[in-house]
Design a protein with these regions (language model features):
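Amphipathic alpha-helical recognition patches that constitute DNA-binding helices
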Residues: 15, 19, 55
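A short, surface-exposed loop/turn module that caps and links secondary-structure elements
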Residues: 33-58
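Enriched for short, Lys/Arg-rich terminal
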Residues: 1-9, 17-18, 26-29, 43, ...
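Beta-strand-connecting loop/turn residues
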Residues: 12, 52-54, 73-74
Length: 107
């Protein structure tokens, strides 16, 4: 991979980065360590949801997930998610963010 970047909303907020900063430090370190493994193409537990939308799954906390896409060999972290109860809503929001990238509204 060439790199990893955070999806940025038009208002400048970065959902995944903001979520990481709000986590307990020990949990944040574990999640960031896992994200860094992606540089070596070690995705660990992940699932392809659609042709260009993936779910990085964690066994930490409430079963956290990070939805991401790959654009030009760069991982774009779109959205974090907590538990399964709102998973379909989270996936729809991640798809919206992905469509924004595709439409060059936000990259």
């Amino acid at each position: 991979m060439k790199g990893i970047k955070f999806y940025k909303l038009p208002n400048g907020k970065e959902p995944v980065k903001d979520w990481l900063l709000d986590l307990d430090k020990s949990l944040r370190v574990k999640i960031i360590s896992r994200i860094e493994l992606i540089y070596d193409d070690n995705f660990g537990d992940y699932k392809k949801l659609y042709s260009d939308l993936y779910e990085l799954r964690f066994t930490l906390g409430k079963g956290y997930r990070i939805y991401y896409t790959i654009q030009n060999d760069v991982i774009v972290l779109l959205l974090n998610a907590g538990d399964k109860s709102k998973q379909s809503k989270d996936i729809e929001l991640a798809k919206t963010y992905l469509n924004n990238i595709k439409d060059n509204k936000n990259d």
